[in-house]
Amino acid sequence: MNAITTLNGTTATFTVRGDIDFDTLPPLRAAADALPAHVTDLRWDLNHTCFMDIAGLHLLFAPTPPGHAYRRITVTGLRPQPLRLLRLAAETNPATFPLDRLLCDVRAPL
């Protein structure tokens, strides 16, 4: 897995290439935590991510760490398996996994 970070004003986009699992979660989380303080929007581009396990849920729905400002998190380019996982999580526990605030380009009905 590798990730490319693009900064555009107050938005950071992480383009992830490869799976998101417990092996790849720590470096992704560290990269997000290291973003400059002026970044208020964090977008995960998952066009090249075919598989995501529960670690992806931890990455996308983690609470804001103490001492960090709130960042709006969105995801784009969801492939079928990660989208299926997110939908299942939202169906099981919509209060914990509010899918509507995360998705920015999925046109299929939720």
Q: Language-model segments: what does each one mean?
A:
Residues 1-110:
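STAS-like cytosolic regulatory interaction modules
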